[in-house]
Swiss-Prot record:
InterPro entries: Hfq (IPR005001), LSM_dom_sf (IPR010920), Sm (IPR047575). The lineage of its organism: Bacteria, Bacillati, Bacillota, Clostridia, Thermoanaerobacterales. The keyword RNA-binding applies. This is RNA-binding protein Hfq. Homohexamer.
């Protein structure tokens, strides 16, 4: 995998962030959080919900469900930011 190519996880999170798609995040303890992804890195996701920000560690996340389908192809290389090498 080249340095400028995103993995599927990053492509998905980046698209829901850029398109401002609401998500439901299920944690491994069964708790649910609903909101909008504002940022992420290798270890955490920042979720904005009801005017508050939550930093969620990725190892605590079980599932992320977007409110509508997300096209991860665009984020993986179908746009000018991430061209295939």
């Amino acid at each position: 995998m080249s340095k400028n190519q995103l993995n599927l996880q990053d492509a998905f999170l980046n698209q829901v962030r850029k398109e401002n798609v609401g998500v439901t995040i299920f944690l491994i303890n069964g708790f649910q959080l609903k909101g909008f992804v504002k940022g992420f890195d290798n270890f955490t996701v920042i979720l904005e919900s009801e005017g508050k920000q939550h930093m969620i560690y990725k190892h605590a996340i079980s599932t992320i469900i977007p409110q509508r389908p997300v096209n991860t192809y665009l984020a993986k290389g179908g746009n000018e930011e991430n061209t295939p090498s």
